[in-house]
Structure formats: C-alpha cells, structure tokens
Amino acid sequence: MEVTNQSNGCSNNEKESPYISSVLPGWFSEISPLWPGEAHSLKVEKILFQGKSDYQNVMVFQSSTYGKVLVLDGVIQLTERDECAYQEMITHLPLCSIPNPKKVLVIGGGDGGVLREVSRHSSVEQIDICEIDKMVVEVAKEFFPDVAVGYEDPRVNLHIGDGVAFLKNVPAGTYDAVIVDSSDPIGPAQELFEKPFFESIARALRPGGVVSTQAESIWLHMHIIEEIVANCRQIFKGSVNYAWTTVPTYPSGMIGFMLCSTEGPAVDFKNPINPIDDESGPKTIAPLKFYNSEIHQASFCLPSFAKRVIESKGK
C-alpha cells in the first residue's frame, strides 16, 4: 500500500500545524516538536475515512495491532485497544472522589468516550458536552460505536461550539464536575491550558466542585505541567493533584491529569469515596476495562523527579 501525505488529508494544514504525520508504505507515523527526536508508528491495514472539517483534518484507519484509530490533524486521539485507559481515568478520578455528582460538563471529548464513562454514575442527572467540531462526533458514531455509545444516554445535552465561550456563559456554581478532554496545547487548544480558562472553570463549579483536565506527560512536558500546576494552585483553593495513567499509543506511553477542587467541602482525590464497579452504568455499555479503586489510588504516586517539581509549585 502506497499512501502519501496528500492522501492522508494532512497536507492542507501542514503550514498551520507543527505536527508532521504521514502514512508511508503501510505505516502511520506521528512526529511533533512537543516530543522532538522521536516518533510513534502503527501499521496501517486500511484507511477507513479521510475528511477536512472547518477546524482540522480527520482520519480513521484500521491498524494491525490496536484496532481502529482516530487521528486529528495528524495526531492519534484514540485507538480501540487502549482508549479505556484514558477515558475511564479522566472521568472516574474526579467523579469517584465526590459524593453523588449531579451535573457534569465535558469540554471537548467529541468521540463520546468520556460521556460513556460519566453515564456509569447513577447519581448524575445532567451531562452537558461542548465539542467544537461536529465532524468528530459524526465520525465517532460511525466508526467507534462502542466509544460513542455515551451519546445515547438521555441525560446528555450536546452543544456544538467553542468550549471557552460556552464556559463564560455558564451561571456561577452550576456544575459538580467539569472534565476537559483537550488535545495538546498547540493552536486553538492552547487556550484550554491557560489561566483565564481555569478561572472560568472555577467560577462554573459549585463549592467543593471538581475538575479533571488532560495534563500532558511527565517524561516530555514537565515545563508545561509546572505552569499548569502553578496556575491551578492560584485559582483552586481546595485540592490540587497530578495523576497519570498508561496509554501505549500516546507519546511516552503515558498521559497525566490535573485534579482540582474549589473551596468548600474537602475533596481527597487520592481516596475514592464514591466507588463504581464493573457492572455500573447502562446495560448497553461494556464493563470497565481499566479503572478500579486500587489503580485510582496508585495513579497519584509519582516518580521522584516529577514529585519534586510538582510539590515545589505548591510552596
């Protein structure tokens, strides 16, 4: 199979995006200045979809080892094999840390995976999701039905639009939890890592409300993590913690999360008080594959080099 950059749908944005991805004879490779000197490649069996939305290039391909793969602007977003490690952790780390969450907002997450996980919590009455790119939602429903199954939940309200603008219009104290499933801090997603955005989240949360946001890799992005931690400690007057999980197809094989709470009822993220089990949620959803209470607690254990840096930002 011979496929070039032009045919993978990435060429139109090459000047706009610093990512350099390609499908060469039988292989997809992802390269970025965020992880210089290395690349991650997956063998391609078949390209299933290529399209260009108003915001980005979208591609789906069948890999030989990780099932179907969703790629946005040349960056792997999820694979069928390991998406559970990300979706389950970014969702249940916050929601299992507070009693009876009722209103949840998801920023990004157009593939529907976070929605699927939120729907496991029977106490939740309202799930709002704000995704900027309608094509991502449509592609996920067509090619990743086991991920996008969350959209079938009647508690879900989908808003197509900019998450930053959406948050600015949310009445103060609306949500028990906000989950930010963002891409890397390049281009439009840069706003989702900056102080004004975190301030908007804090305003939208009730006292003792929680936020979980994608927070990069300790192996590649400590300088970004330092800034995120510093901003969060200024804004969130409850708890501020960094946790992580393993995702083989993400750069360095892991990804982190910032877990923060607003001033109010104390939140101890490291000790889940609202546990779920393998059978939680609608019958249309498969049992948990990754998350459990033990891995919840373990996810906050950091290697010494990262622990020193993160703790120093709290002084």
Swiss-Prot record:
Q: Give me the disulphide-bonded residues.
A: none
Q: Where is the active site?
A: D181
Give the GO cellular component terms, alphabetically.
cytosol
Amino-acid positions noted as binding S-adenosyl 3-(methylsulfanyl)propylamine in the UniProt annotation, renumbered to this chain: Q56, Q87, D111, E131, D162, G163, D181
InterPro entries given for it? PABS (IPR030374), PABS_CS (IPR030373), SAM-dependent_MTases_sf (IPR029063), Spermi_synthase (IPR001045), Spermi_synthase_euk (IPR030668), Spermidine_synt_N (IPR035246), Spermidine_synt_N_sf (IPR037163)
Pathway of action? Amine and polyamine biosynthesis; spermidine biosynthesis; spermidine from putrescine: step 1/1
User: Start and end of every PABS domain?
Assistant: 25-262
- The UniProt record lists the keyword Coiled coil: no
> Which PANTHER family does its entry note?
SPERMIDINE SYNTHASE, SPERMIDINE/SPERMINE SYNTHASE
The record's similarity note reads:
Belongs to the spermidine/spermine synthase family.
Stated name of the protein: Spermidine synthase 1
Query: Origin organism of this chain?
Result: Hyoscyamus niger (Black henbane)
